[in-house]
């Protein structure tokens, strides 16, 4: 086999591979000899079929198998011998001329094919002990713990029917019918809908108009849908809701005590506080870790400047751009609405894609040099987490990861990256800084790994790399009329 390099331009490589016809024929003859005693051909005893006859009958099919195997297996071996790693699967090209292909299958012509690929650049790792980061720490107060417990208690609060009129904090059970321009709209009708006044679960202006109503009252409520409402046919529109109040119920008093803890399935209020404190600390810890990662990635970005494989950059850009356009379509906005242009956005996100690819290669090299691996147990836990997100679709998800090439990499990559980050955090210079909750959760655009501008569409793209720690509370339950459908479609951070 002869390998000739025909292109070496930057990271791009092209190779011409030539396997002499004689070598191909020799391999074919070996295979035919292996099956000689197994084939059954009328007129010949087992094992007595002449080699020429066997070749005439099966030669081309065996040669076709050889060609497929060579194209499948040789590229990786060739790159390994050259000490190169391909950024993506090498592109293989063979002759498309039928006459020439027939000659190859008949061992009358050399088998030639070309490989086109981009190499992963060699990365010389640098010491990281010069990286300095600030770890923001929030001290969770007793008041914050109690405040969170009260929210939990309120979600489990009981209500008792009352005879008087509805007030703030009361639960109103009602039937309603929503209309725009006097015409009912889809999702605007419900019966026995429950709404706690002051919960802000329905669109602005709705709940306040329930105050003062009692069971049996009927009223027409006038509201205006927010301009950013997800349903484009309702956004910014004036609407009316025909309301029939069926019950008004007052909330029971809520106290933070052992009785509340028992109601929530715990043995004491101290245990309840311990659990809630741990949850809050975990939430803050996640935000802190994201900020630490951003600081490390920003400094690694300054340390490593090299050409990134264009095919990887193209693929990353396509993913980002697809998400950006999806976000714009869902919000009903344009690039102009976001105070930018499509060309400017493309340039910005192209730079972001290049940054991501470069940093991904650096992290991969760090992990490889440190012999960091992802265990089968870790992969199983990641798969289980995926299954929990899609109840009822477990078989389809398992089949997808089992049968889709590269799908398991989507499970492995985040685990690998977090383990590499653990290593880096243990080696860089870390200074702890006590901050307030507000300071920790304040949006830090300049430090965001995605470098988003102050545009909502761009902020959404940022979430692919840097999940926000403070999730937005979902809008109402199934009461579609006055809720924001964004709770179903929105961000899961």
Curated annotation (Swiss-Prot):
Keywords: Cell cycle, Cell division, Chaperone, Cytoplasm, Isomerase, Rotamase
UniProt enzyme class: isomerase
Top-level taxonomic group: Bacteria
Pfam families for this protein: FKBP_C, Trigger_C, Trigger_N
Region listing for Disordered, in residue ranges: 439-493
Reactions mediated catalytically: [protein]-peptidylproline (omega=180) = [protein]-peptidylproline (omega=0)
Subcellular location: Cytoplasm
Database matches in Gene3D superfamilies: 3.10.50.40, Trigger factor ribosome-binding domain (3.30.70.1050), Trigger factor, C-terminal domain (1.10.3120.10)
Domain PPIase FKBP-type: 169-254
Cellular component GO terms, alphabetical: cytoplasm
One example of a Gene Ontology biological process annotation: 'de novo' cotranslational protein folding
EC annotation from Swiss-Prot or TrEMBL: 5.2.1.8
SUPFAM superfamilies found in the cross-reference section: FKBP-like (SSF54534), Triger factor/SurA peptide-binding domain-like (SSF109998), Trigger factor ribosome-binding domain (SSF102735)
Gene Ontology molecular function, alphabetical: peptidyl-prolyl cis-trans isomerase activity; protein folding chaperone; ribosome binding
UniProt comment concerning the protein's domains: Consists of 3 domains; the N-terminus binds the ribosome, the middle domain has PPIase activity, while the C-terminus has intrinsic chaperone activity on its own.
Family (UniProt): Belongs to the FKBP-type PPIase family. Tig subfamily.
Function recorded in the entry: Involved in protein export. Acts as a chaperone by maintaining the newly synthesized protein in an open conformation. Functions as a peptidyl-prolyl cis-trans isomerase.
HAMAP family, A to Z: Trigger_factor_Tig
Protein name, as recorded: Trigger factor
Lineage start: Bacteria, Pseudomonadati, Pseudomonadota, Alphaproteobacteria, Hyphomicrobiales
